[in-house]
Each structure stands twice: as C-alpha cells, then as structure tokens.
Regions:
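Short N-terminal helix/helix-N-cap motif within the alpha/beta-hydrolase-1
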Residues: 101-105, 132
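Conserved class I S-adenosyl-L-methionine
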Residues: 122-143
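Acceptor-substrate binding/catalytic loop of class I
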Residues: 144-161
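Conserved N-terminal segment of class I S-adenosyl-L-methionine
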Residues: 1-90, 104-107, 138, 177-219, ...
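A short glycine-rich, Lys/Arg-flanked "PGG" loop and its adjoining helix->strand segment in the class I
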Residues: 104-119
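Adenine-nucleotide cofactor-binding loop residues
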Residues: 75, 97, 128
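A short SAM/SAH-binding and catalytic strip from SAM-dependent methyltransferases
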Residues: 89-101
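A SAM-dependent methyltransferase catalytic signature shared across enzymes that methylate proteins
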Residues: 162-177
Length: 224
C-alpha cells in the first residue's frame, strides 16, 4: 500500500482551535502520530479520544495519546464498529477527506447517526491555490510525497466545492478560514493574471484572488 503523507509531530493548530472546547468524546479519522490528540488532551484531560488510522506504524504511534485506536480505514468499518463510535461530540478529518475514495458516503454515514449538537472539523487542501493554477498553466502537474499534489490524494476541492461536499451530505459550514502562509504569497504578476482570468470568466476578481491565497481550508461543519 502506498504510504500516505509522511508522519510529523507538529499539530494543526487551526484544526485544534476549531474543536469545541466542551467536546468529551472525539473521533479522529486519520490520527497519524496522535499529536492532535496529545494537544487536545493537554487542555481537556477528561476527553475520550478515539483515533482511526489505516497505517499500522502510525496507528501504533497514535496509541501514545489516544484512548482507543482502530487500525482501519474509516471507509471499511462495518456497521457494528461504526456504530460503536457514537455518540461523539466532534469528528476530525485533518487532511483525510481528500484521501478517501468516497468522502460523500462517509459523511452521509456520519450524518445518519450524529447528534444535533455535534461537529465535524476538517482540513482540506485547496486545489485553487495560486501555485496550482500557475503550474497547470505551464503544464506542470507532478505528484509528490506531500503537499497539494500528494500522490495519495484522490479528491480535489476548492472553497466552493468543499462547501458543497458538506451541504450535499446534510451539513453546513458554521465557521472556518483558509490557511495562508506568508512565505507563499504570490507576486503582483500572478495576482494580476488571476484577476484577469476571473474577469474573463465573469467571476469576482477579488474573491478569486482571495481564494487563491489559501493553501488549505479549515472548517467546522454542523448538521443542517
């Protein structure tokens, strides 16, 4: 099996900050090395944290911080195992949904069981990022070991299609923002080119530039 994004020990603080503070039961799909569990449990030691991790090595690392770890793909859990994850106050998909064959089915499956006050916190790569647009413009589309062109990505999302992913599965995006890295800001010529393309296609130029700045989208969705 092809290895997913290389493990690291740096938590996604934007995801951490979107987890409702009162969450007593959390399920994280793709718990990797367990660093998000580590950081959340520093603040909320009484939380019961379940990790689901498809990679055996990462699953073992997750056990350092998670109360329970399932070595499995969330897409392959049978009904008994899936039902055992409920109730949960928050589900986390930090750089995971893009790796799934059918993220729509996974979200619908959660929606059919989730309580009204629960949340989903997700981080998804932005295929509309200016670097992607620039590379596609010159015919450069080469898969890599990590990043926007991670070779294990199966799905691609813009801000609008990310919102549609949740809306079409019974959720609505309650809050969120783009992850913008200052060292990856586009130059004036790139910005102008994005504005020109937006205007040529009848889109809002300012929105197009703003959407191109986000490397990833980090959002919290709730049942609609």
């Amino acid at each position: 099996m092809m290895k997913q994004t290389p493990v690291n020990e740096i938590p996604n603080l934007e995801v951490l900050n979107l987890i409702p503070g009162g969450s007593k039961r959390i399920v994280e799909a793709g718990s990797s090395s367990g660093v998000l569990a580590r950081e959340y449990k520093k603040l909320h030691a009484d939380c019961h944290y379940t990790g689901i991790e498809v990679d055996a090595e990462y699953a073992e690392l997750s056990r350092r911080y998670c109360d329970v770890v399932l070595h499995a793909s969330i897409e392959n859990l049978d009904d008994r195992a899936f039902d055992g994850l409920f109730p949960a106050d928050c589900w986390i998909f930090a750089d995971v949904l893009e790796h799934l064959v059918d993220p729509w089915s996974v979200l619908r499956r959660i929606r059919s069981r989730i309580s009204a006050g629960a949340s989903i916190v997700a981080c998804l790569p932005n295929v509309q990022h200016w670097s992607m647009q620039a590379n596609i413009n010159r015919g450069h589309f080469v898969y890599e070991d990590s990043g926007l062109l991670d070779r294990t990505h199966l799905r691609w999302f813009t801000r609008l299609s990310m919102a549609d992913l949740f809306q079409s599965t019974g959720f609505r995006v309650a809050e969120g923002a783009g992850r913008i890295y200052s060292h990856m800001e586009p130059g004036a010529k790139i910005r102008a080119a994005i504005q020109t393309m937006a205007e040529a296609t009848g889109a809002n130029a300012e929105v197009a530039v703003n959407d191109a700045l986000a490397f990833q989208w980090v959002v919290r969705a709730v049942p609609a």
